[in-house]
Amino acid sequence: MKRCIFAIMAAMLLCGCSIKEEPDTLAVSFFDVGKADSFLMTCGGKNLLMDAGTAKDGKKVAKRLEDMGVESIDYLMITHFDRDHAGGAAQIIQDFDVKALLRPEYMKESDESAACMAAAEDRGVKVIIITSQTDIQLGSTKLVIHPADKVYENDASNNSSLVTEVFHGNNSLLFTGDIEKERIADIKYELNDAGYDFLKVPHHGKYETMLQEFFNWVGAQSAVITSSKKNPEEQETIQALEDAGVKDILLTRGGEITLQSDGRKLDFTQK
C-alpha cells in the first residue's frame, strides 16, 4: 500500500501536479455588544480584534476573550474612534498582551480615544497608523486594509473608518466600519475586488439611499448587522439587502454570531 501511495505521488509530480495544502480555518466571532462593534478574527494561531465596543463593553469583551482562551492579541484594529468602536479599547490593552494597535490617521478627540492611546503608551504597544493600503497575514488569511484617502467634510470620523477586505481560500469578506454615504459612493474606487461572499453592513444598518447600488455591487450571499433590540437596524436596509439577493442576514441583537470559513464555504452559528 505504501509503495502504491508513493507511486501515485511520484506520478503527480512527474505530471506537474502538486498536492494543494488546505488553508487553516478562519473564524470570526461577532460579539453581542448591542449597537456597537467588536469582532475577533482567528486563523493559523494568529488573531485580530476589530474594535472593542463602548467603554462599558470593554469588560464584557475582555471576559469573552478570556473564556475563549485568548491570552494575547496580535492586532487590535480600531476602525475609527467613535465611542461604540473604540470605547473598550483601553480595557483590552490593559488586560491583554496586545502586540500592535492599528488605527486610522484621523482620530476624533474624545475621552475614549485619549484613554486608548494612553493605555497603548503605558503598555508599550506598537501603534501603526494606516495611511495607505496595508496588507497583513493571519495564518492563511490575507487582510487588505484601506484607509480613507481624504478627511470628509461630513461625518469625518465614520467616513474615516478603516475598510478591510479579507481573503481566505476562495472566500472573500468585506468589513466596512461605519462608512456613510460619502465614503460609500467612493468605496468601489478604493477596493481591489468587486464581488464578495460576505459583508459586514455599514453603520449598524443605518439606511442610506445609495445602499441598494452598493449592496448590488458587493454581491454578497451573507451579511451581519451589528444592532440591538433598543436600537435596531432600519427595515429599509434589510429590504435593500434582500433585493440585492443576500440570502443570510444575521443580526447581533439575536446573540453572538460565529462565522467559519474552510476556504470554500462559509458557515454561521448564533447563540
Where are these regions (language model features)?
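Non-globular, low-confidence helical/coil segments that flank catalytic cores
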Residues: K2-R3, L13-K271
